[in-house]
Amino acid sequence: MVKISFQPAVAGVKAEKADKAAASGPASASAPAAEILLTPAREERPPRHRSRKGGSVGGVCYLSMGMVVLLMGLVFASVYIYRYFFLAQLARDNFFHCGVLYEDSLSSQIRTRLELEEDVKIYLEENYERINVPVPQFGGGDPADIIHDFQRGLTAYHDISLDKCYVIELNTTIVLPPRNFWELLMNVKRGTYLPQTYIIQEEMVVTEHVRDKEALGSFIYHLCNGKDTYRLRRRATRRRINKRGAKNCNAIRHFENTFVVETLICGVV
């Protein structure tokens, strides 16, 4: 605390005050010196910067960015693993090279035991099957590529020997759906062949030439594009017959079930 005192004024002022004091009388006493007490001002301190709050916000931002980068890395790694490992494994699981032993009661009265091999590719998501039948070792049919398109409800046969395509409505009583066919082949994947089975025969006849192949769907279009393509009409499905009822027919033997099917395409142009 600072004490400030005011002393009496200069001589002129003192004389005036003396005259006034004499006029007022002796009763009046001399006034004491005026004093003012001043409290010293507080020391001004520079404002504190709230560095902690700003620093914490920046730290959260950096942490968030780091988490985003980490998550993006995990996503890209997952996509890579899915594409190059899972899909490759799935493709291997959907591809089958298999065969079946069956008794041939169609070619002769004496039942002979034959072997049929084929490569099967099943597309579960697209809901179609693709079958490749190589040249049979002991005759009994032509090599062929077959597509069963369950979305379109169509079957296409590409007779490799004739280099022609034939299209007909899908026969779901003979052809197993992709999921069921896949389960069947997975169950017998440990072995090389399916259990010994029998053969049935279906007969078809050529009806008309197909010009607009794009209307058949993309799968059949890619199979038959650039080839003469014809529509078929089904005549009959028979089992264990000893004599073929039609001449001028081409046979394709294949299986999409627990039995073998011989498809006769008659009236070939």
UniProtKB/Swiss-Prot annotation:
The record marks 243-244 as: Cleavage. The modification Phosphothreonine is found at residue 39. Pfam families: BRICHOS (PF04089). SMART domains: BRICHOS. PROSITE patterns: BRICHOS. GO terms for molecular function: amyloid-beta binding; ATP binding. InterPro entries: BRICHOS_dom, ITM2. It is a single-pass type II membrane protein. The chain crosses the membrane at residues 57-77. One of its GO terms (biological process) is positive regulation of extrinsic apoptotic signaling pathway. Residues 138-232 form the BRICHOS domain. Keywords: Cell membrane, Cleavage on pair of basic residues, Disulfide bond, Glycoprotein, Lysosome, Membrane, Phosphoprotein, Signal-anchor, Transmembrane, Transmembrane helix. GO terms for cellular component: Golgi apparatus; lysosomal membrane; lysosome; perinuclear region of cytoplasm; plasma membrane. It is found in: Lysosome membrane; Cell membrane. Glycans are attached at residue 171. Its main location: membrane. Disulfide bonds join 165-224. The keyword Phosphoprotein applies. Type I membrane-bound, as well as soluble, furin has a pre-eminent role in ITM2C proteolytic processing. PCSK7 and PCSK5 may also be involved although to a lesser extent. The soluble form of PCSK7 is incapable of processing ITM2C. Fails to undergo shedding by ADAM10 and intramembrane cleavage by SPPL2B. Belongs to the ITM2 family. Interacts with BACE1. Interacts with APP. Interacts with STMN2. Negative regulator of amyloid-beta peptide production. May inhibit the processing of APP by blocking its access to alpha- and beta-secretase. Binding to the beta-secretase-cleaved APP C-terminal fragment is negligible, suggesting that ITM2C is a poor gamma-secretase cleavage inhibitor. May play a role in TNF-induced cell death and neuronal differentiation. This is Integral membrane protein 2C.
